[in-house]
Every structure is written in C-alpha cells, then in structure tokens.
Amino acid sequence: MIFYVGLHQPSDAARVARPCMVSVNRLRGRRSDFAVGRWLLDSGAFTEVAIHGGYRDGPEVYARQAARWAGCGALDAAVSQDYMCEPFVLARTGLSVAAHQALTIARYDALRLLVPPSIYLMPVLQGYLPEQYAAHVAAYGARLRPGMWTGAGSVCKRNGRPGDMAAVLRAIKAARPDLRLHAFGAKLTALHSADVRELLHSADSMAWSYSARKQGRDANDWREAAAFASRIDGWRPARSPMEDLWSN
C-alpha cells in the first residue's frame, strides 16, 4: 500500500521527503513552485461541499490549478471533484445519495475534458452503504477502465469501525476486483487493520495533525507528519497474493 501523508503547507513536502497529499486550497494563492517528490493533488471537496454546499467555481478552475502545479515534482494524480455522501453532508446540500453520485460522475466527465491528458484524473466512488458504492461502480460504467486507480470516498468517518470500511471496499471489489482503491482521510485504527489494508492500493491521512493538537504538540509541525508516515510504513503486512495484480 502506498501511503500519502497529508500536509498543511506545500513547502513542507521537501522536508517530509515522502509521498504526500496537498490540497488545492493550499495552492490557490501561491505563485511559486514548491519542491516535492511523489504527491497527490486533493480537490478540496470537503471544504466546498460540506461547508459551502457545493463547488463555488466551475471545473475549469480546478483543471487550471491541476495544470499549473503538475510540473512540481512527480504528480501521481489529481483527485476528481466528488460529492460526499455522509448524512451531515446530505443535510447541508438537501440532496440524496443518488443525486450526489450523479453529480460526482458529471463533475468527473467535465474535468476529463479540461484536465490535460498528461495528468491522471482519479475518479471517486461515492455512497454510504456498501450496496450504494456497488451501484456507483455500475453507474460509472466504461469510464472505469481495467485496473483503474480509483478513490473510495466518504469512508473517513468510519475509521473507528474498520469492519464498516472493509465492507465498503469489499463491495467495490466484488463489483470490480481489478480496481486499485484509494482511501481518503484514513486514520490509524483503519490503517492498522489488515482487513482494510489488503483491499487498498493507497491511502492518505492527516490524522497526525489532530493527534498532535490533542496531545498538546504543534499540529503544523512537518516532523509530526514525517513520524506519522514512518509509523504507517512500519505496519506493512505480509505481501498479499493480489498485490502483484493491483500493481500491474
């Protein structure tokens, strides 16, 4: 499993010297390039949808941001702009899970036409119940090519219940065993679960920041991020027989 540690400051990427996740929200006002190795560009979906009730800008704005920062380091993927399906997010938008799933696909379709083909645009599967994720796989149809690296959204609130997260991932794998899954915002409890890790190709997390703040340390210290990433890497389980397939 590839782990991307989430960072508050893009400038910390060079210090951490590990695969990292940087939000587009941290780059909007930035002018200069930043040093980084492997990284993911986060779409800032939580801020937009959960707080503002939807995207304040059209997809062309995010596409321009992806193109602007793709030259920094080795950008593995720009995450597509999805619509989360947790109950509190649905309460904010007033829409249903099915509506959020349709909006997620529509946004992906729009971005595919705008993001340069040299940048991998990661599609995101949404839902809340396992069967809803399976339905979203079907709705994507041929958009999800064989072996595609695909995000599993709305799983971060299940971190305290790894079995629930694993059930979602298994439902997706049952529908499309070839997909290489990425978990957003995973916490230690979930990442420590072999049931979860064996289903994932990759994951990201900023749990280090919350933990540092809760324990009275600096929640913005890059050394906290580096230590957290080292801890995750140290939990690598025995190689799964499926890992070679997912790595192809």
Regions found by a protein language model. Give the residues of each.
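Intrinsically disordered, low-complexity regions enriched in small/polar residues
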Residues: 5-6, 48, 57, 64, ...
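Short, charged, surface-exposed secondary-structure boundary motifs
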Residues: 31-33, 49-53, 135, 159-163, ...
